[in-house]
Amino acid sequence: MLLLENKKIENNKMKKIYNNLSIENLTKTEWFNWFNEYEQQEIIKGLEKNLDVSWYAKQEYSWTQMKQLRIGLEDNLDVSFYANPELTCFQMLEIYIGLRKKLNVSIYTDPRFNSLKMKEIRMGLQKNLDVSVYAKPYFSNYEMKEIRLGLRDHLDVALYAKKDFNCLQMEQIRLGLKKNLNVLLYANPDFNPDQMKELRYGIKRGLDASIYAKKDFNCRQMEEIRLGLKNNLDVSLYANSEISWQEMREIKLKLQKESTQL
């Protein structure tokens, strides 16, 4: 509230500079010459439409920021939500879009949210999702997207909406939940996305993925064990993390050949 009050006081002071001046005379003032050509154009455009340019006729704003504020004023929006020089013009645009759609933009006006993060929060608000689950600065925009998609599909996002997971790990957990799989077997930050994928494939096929749900196996080793299980082979003969995936493949192929000869 104090910040907004200070802005109003500053705006009132600035109004005195041009309230009684024509646009032509205003352009001849020392104050006007503080701004570069592009900034001056934004001020003139605002004045020509009788806008309260005191919101943006300030040196701390670039002309692109001024433009976003001017457009907001033209649309009769409450630009106080984004009249902040700490926000980039792209962040301002996301807040502007939210205001146009009558969303509660206060949830994402924090400058710590870059424009891409703001977009994910805005998209969630547009679908009436509980964006508080992911409207947190420590999530990347990609992580926010995975949580948003999970909320959209009514999934238990609490299983992966955590700082411990990156966006690719979140994706694997989300895809498993979407297919009603028991993701608890691999919803573990110790597994990388490729390992999670192999476990998801195994669970999806109804295989005993617990046999290779060990972080010591890399994804290629997991794949060979999974393919062995798929073909009803005795994978215990090569399910050893000390055996390379190439050796595992050789053993697997040998077991497959023997099984066809029976």
Predicted regions and their residues:
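General marker for long, soluble alpha-helical cores
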Residues: 2-262
